[in-house]
Amino acid sequence: MKNKIYMYLFFSIGIFLVSSTLNGQDFARFPGSFLRMGTTARAVGLGSALTADSHHGLTGVYNPAGTAFLEKRHGTAGHQILSLDRQLSCVGVTIKLPPTAGIGIAWIHGGVNRIEERNSQGEYSGRISTGENAFVLSFAQKFSGRVAFGLNAKIMTHTLPIYDEKLSGTAVGVDVGLLYKLNNFVQFGGVVQNLNAKYQWKTNTIFEETGTIYYDNFPVIYRAGIKTRFVNFQVLCDVEFVTNDSMLLGKRLNGGIEYYLNENITFRSGFGEKRFGIGFGYTYFKLDNFGVTMDYSAVVDEVQKFNGITHVISSSFSF
């Protein structure tokens, strides 16, 4: 038991050190940054290295092909309370469509509340908020029992307060994914995200004379991942390439390890999306095919290292 704990800690530290050298790029200035922060407690606890995973109600968000490999229906809900009045929430459901397909739907929201508004003289005039939403519809089809192809259709919205008006941008994008199950222990995954996604801003609704239509492109993200399952733990690793207009903006390595203490308790840690997380999952209710799991992760990122630890809580159920 002690040797297994040492191995778990050693791998966690190794993932942190290796990933730190490859995660120096900053893509926060590009649209959709809230989608690149991780969603549930399990996701951030594993460094968001879920390209080759097929486990939960938000499987399609990371790789739509994973929905075809789920044996049960899964639901997931999570919430992150971040520093600087930021928040991130998600809800998702994935359903198996017999005999060889799967479908999922998810909603992700990220926003900032209680922003101080000031007039041209610098005087306080109230508080405002801004937020982004993503609605994701996933579908996947499995072939020959080992290979699945999947597709996401996504609608993203972004609302910005300007004076007494609300400026809204809307984007429609597509994700394409592949998942290959080599055997019961090894899975490979690949996904291309944000194809054709770009916010369209119509400022002429606020500035009648000087307004225009402006497009803000999402970065296209290429991911490849592997998941390896052992007797009582599994290792997940992703490599990620972020591009914009065919130009490589940078690359990142995300990874995590998940250790099963028993059938009810799981420990995990990982580094990815410039966030280091460690946490656990506890299945506190089981009845036939129905089960409920509570997940928790403590996360540190580039912002939180000056403002304490982010606590991420999520719950998932299978039925």
Question: How would you label these PLM feature ranges?
Answer:
Residues 19-25:
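Bacterial Sec-dependent signal peptides at the C-terminal "C-region" and cleavage site
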Residues 55:
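N-terminal glycine-rich anion-binding loops that anchor highly charged ligand groups
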Residues 1-7, 145:
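Positively charged n-region of N-terminal signal peptides that target proteins for export
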Residues 58-69:
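N-terminal periplasmic accessory domains that precede
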Residues 25-47, 72-75, 80, 87-319:
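Outer-membrane beta-barrel porins/channels
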